[in-house]
Amino acid sequence: MFVDRAEVFVKSGSGGNGSVSFRREKYVPRGGPDGGDGGKGGDVILVVDPEITTLLDFSYKKKYVAEKGENGSGSKCFGKNGENLYIKVPLGTVIRDVDTNKIMADLSHIGDKYIVAKGGKGGRGNVRFTTAVRQAPDFAEPGMPGEERYISLELKILADVGLLGFPNVGKSTLLSVVTKAAPKIANYHFTTLSPNLGVVNIPGIQSFVIADIPGIIEGAAEGVGLGIDFLRHIERTRLLIHIVDISGLEGRDPFGDFIKINEELKKYDVKLWDRPQIIAANKADMLYDDSIFQDFKKKVENLGYNKVFKISAATRQGVEELMKEAAAMLTNIPVTDMHISEEDKFIPEEKRFTYEIEKQGNVYVVKGSFVDRLLASINVNDANELRYFHKVLQNKGVMKQLIDMGIKDGDVVRLNDFEFDYIL
């Protein structure tokens, strides 16, 4: 089954906690601190695997969590870092952050990888807090939490040439003739329900990848039929081969079909409409009057399309010449990566411990991630740790902000469940 969209939850590992530990050594206060740092949490990393061609696996597994970092221990032993979690995705996968809908990465080259969730930093052990005055710190830092988010994966197939046209004009037949691909072929509309890829290998020309893009009909840009689901797969192609049924056996007007498909391209993305096209008038073996082809050719040439071929995919008439022209045109069309504008680009938030102060009468409530982390690392009932606590508040600017807010002697400062009286 071809699946080209998925949404999953990813979470990196939290950092391990720093250790509170003391070595046993004579004449060293409390044995001397020797608590090691916690290990870093594992990252969640998406990596391209060229052997994968669909996002089907993500239909069954929706949650990916990396390993936590191990806690530090005595003798200054650092905790082991958590293992990174590698998730394989197909070539051409676009990653978006679900909350912002911003593009995180476009994995369009073999070897590409992207960290979608960075592991938390390990907490510092108590040996890190030793000073000339504080020789036996009885506290350590907890590990930083890992990142978590929902991401959407969108597969936009990578092909040099896209086969374009209404259903049942012979796109799949042409693909099967010029490549080793084996798409489903039958004489009814929408036989092909997913893009098919193949490599064109013809002696004397540079090989290239070609894709049969199904489901494009009038109204596709608004989602009619299979519509937008497959229009986006054309975005990466450098050249389009626009196939029409020149035989008219189904009562269709080839020129009218040509105009309608191009209108859909223009409505979806004007850059697609402006992409180079070769026109392939297919089913010429069933054409009863060559003047029909000549009239069609004249009309499209008047619109500026001068690469028009009369072919029959079924009998292979004109097919090799068509492929040679495509290969020749590709040599002059550069390969360009997907452009991500600054507006669409995802910028990860910097991990910062912040706080805010709210005045409630004579009580000043300090809250935020900074407060949570600080209180998690110390014992406020210990005099030495309490001195460290006040020093951190001073260095962080909390005390200055309290003064600027007009705190008075005897007012209360509250941090979560801990509070103290402010003394000038």
Curated annotation (Swiss-Prot):
Main subcellular location of this protein, as a coarse class: cytoplasm
OCT domain mapped to chain residues: 345-424
Binding of GTP, residues: 165-172, 190-194, 212-215, 282-285, 312-314
Sorted UniProt keywords: Cytoplasm, GTP-binding, Hydrolase, Magnesium, Metal-binding, Nucleotide-binding
Compartmental location: Cytoplasm
Highest taxon of the lineage: Bacteria
Domain OBG-type G: 159-331
EC number: 3.6.5.-
Family: Belongs to the TRAFAC class OBG-HflX-like GTPase superfamily. OBG GTPase family.
Species annotation: Clostridium kluyveri (strain NBRC 12016)
Biased composition (Gly residues): 32-42
EC class: hydrolase
Binding site for Mg(2+): S172, T192
A GO CC term attached to the entry: cytoplasm
Pfam families recorded: DUF1967 (PF09269), GTP1_OBG (PF01018), MMR_HSR1 (PF01926)
Domain called Obg: residue spans: 1-158
Lineage: Bacteria, Bacillati, Bacillota, Clostridia, Eubacteriales
Segments for region (Disordered): 21-42
Protein name: GTPase Obg
Cofactor: Mg(2+)
Gene Ontology BP annotations: ribosome biogenesis
NCBIfam families documented for this protein: Obg_CgtA, Obg_CgtA_exten, PRK12296.1, PRK12297.1, PRK12299.1, small_GTP
Signal peptide interval: none
Quaternary structure annotation from Swiss-Prot or TrEMBL: Monomer.
